[in-house]
Amino acid sequence: MKRVFLMATLLAMTLFSASAQEKEKRCIQLPSWLDNLKLSGYGMTQYQYIGQEGAKSNTFNIRMARIALEGRIAGDFYWKTQIQFNGNTSNLGSSPRMVDLFAEWQKYEMFKVKIGQFKNPFTFENPMHPIVQGFMSYSQNLSKLAGFSDRAGEHASNGRDIGLQLQGDFLKNANGRNLLHYQIGVFNGQGINTKDVDNQKNIIGGVWVMPVKGMRIGAFGWTGSYARKGTWNDDEQGNIVYQKDAAGNPVLDEEGNPKKETFSGVRKLSQNRYAFSFEYNVNDWTLRSEYIHSTGMAFAKSITNHGDANSKDCNLNGKIGNKAQGVYALVIAPIVSKKLYAKARYDMYQANGKTDMMRTQYEAGLNYHISKNFTILTEYALINDRTLQKHNYSMADVEVCFRF
């Protein structure tokens, strides 16, 4: 009996070993760079009420839904790709699209090299996660002057472009904390998922000091152009140009109206911007303020689809001219640390650099972090828009956000 039991045990062990070896042969050996592959994502659902006269609305919305893959290769190289998949495919503003695809060599803390599609190195708020940023939208000056819904007429690009960037931290103090950060990059200047049009690159960069823990004081610069290929009928100030005969008299059409001149080719608009930034995170409080100034004309119509007429319309927006500026200041204060926060923001933007087109948002609300990965954002805003006949109206916003 013992002999039979021993033989059965040996047979079972042999079969188990053979089965394990067979399974091992069938397994696909993943490359080492996939060992630390990370999948992440987040969603932001939204309800928003707008009380503007003649344009009142209240609607549920998917503000944002993204999924990302990231990892490291050979220790020194970090890579990431991220897709935004909410919206529809009718236009570039809300259609699914790739927002990030880059690799960065990170061997040295003071000298890192990044290439691909990623955030413009401009302002403190631009690279912030939208849930961490904490309000119903990024500030107006950031949205219009950092590549989101840019005043120049560029398609919605989430503050990003395609290019090459250098950055680093150095000058450590006695506690080993870096006191200085720099970042500078060369970009196409056309926004995400788009090749260069005028072969002139944008140079964008910034530097900030960190005198005490949690504090940053920075300055940023942006110089370059935004271009389109198409047709236009106006001069460099946005004034319509009419045809004239050899004697200098207006050329009229069949109905007796003056005929417009038509120009064609690549039209590029210089863009020169700078920003000053301050941020202080201390004892669970957040204080931040940024001022941005811009010089440069804008196209009259923004691109929503690269195949439609707007993408080839190179006429200028003479109404807003060649200047713009804006500033915001915000505070996020703990009521219950790590859980419940009160917030307030002053957010002002001048589309033409003057008060007659000034739009100001006075905002207040609460943020409740149910857990590390689940947050509810609430907000009320009083809007003063001087371009409207009735300047003042209210907005309310509630967002339920999750991430993994």
Give the location of each predicted region.
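Outer-membrane beta-barrel pore domains
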Residues: 51-55, 74, 102-106, 117, ...
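N-terminal periplasmic/intermembrane-space "pro-region" immediately following the signal or transit peptide
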Residues: 1-44
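Residues in and immediately flanking transmembrane alpha helices
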Residues: 15-16, 88, 130, 303
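Alpha-helical transmembrane segments and their juxtamembrane interfaces
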Residues: 12-13, 85, 124, 300, ...
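Outer membrane beta-barrel
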Residues: 26-189, 197-204, 208-217, 223, ...
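Active-site-proximal beta-alpha loop/turn segments in soluble metabolic enzymes
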Residues: 185-193, 229-231, 235
